[in-house]
A protein has these predicted regions:
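Terminal low-complexity "docking" segments
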Residues: 2-122, 126-175
């Protein structure tokens, strides 16, 4: 597991206003990048590959999107349909602002291999995220979450939720 550059947690999840985010794998279907461009016009968004060596593939990488605090954005119906057939959407809640969440997720992209080379860790893919929950230590899972209080993804028709308890500061996983 990469040592994601740890950021301080934003306090207890229940004490602060949670912002809603989604992490979308734009490579899920051939039409996903075009659909994202259509739906993202009025929402804060950025590809996690934008400042990476993979920048030339930013349109096909994972995108962080901030959803409105209240109400539903048109993109949400499309995302729910996308996640029915592809493990391509992660619904996140964080007290952190867009830049804090983006910066944290960006720092978790690289995995240092034993030989010193870097590999891309596809944690935004729901299938990979579920496997990571099984193999990472509790501390590593908390590092991956960073400022994220709740992470929900759908794999094989089942919701997987990892959340930080506001009362005990501990991480919980419901699959």
């Amino acid at each position: 597991m990469p040592a994601c550059r740890s950021r301080p947690r934003c306090g207890h999840a229940g004490a602060l206003t949670m912002q809603r985010y989604v992490l979308v794998d734009a490579s899920a279907r051939p039409d996903t990048p075009q659909a994202l461009r259509y739906y993202l016009q009025d929402l804060p968004h950025r590809s996690l590959f934008a400042r990476q060596p993979e920048a030339e593939h930013a349109d096909l990488g994972p995108w962080l999107v901030q959803l409105p605090e209240f109400g539903q954005a048109p993109i949400e119906g499309w995302l729910r349909a996308l996640e029915q057939g592809h493990p391509a959407v992660a619904w996140l809640a964080s007290a952190g602002d867009f830049d804090a969440v983006f910066d944290h997720l960006e720092t978790c992209l690289d995995l240092r291999r034993p030989n010193g080379t870097l590999a891309l860790l596809r944690y935004w893919d729901g299938r990979v995220f579920v496997r990571l929950q099984r193999i990472l230590t509790a501390n590593q899972r908390l590092q991956l979450l960073g400022p994220i209080a709740r992470w929900r993804t759908r794999v094989l028709g089942e919701d997987v939720v990892v959340s930080l308890s506001a009362t005990d500061g501990q991480e919980h996983c419901d699959a």
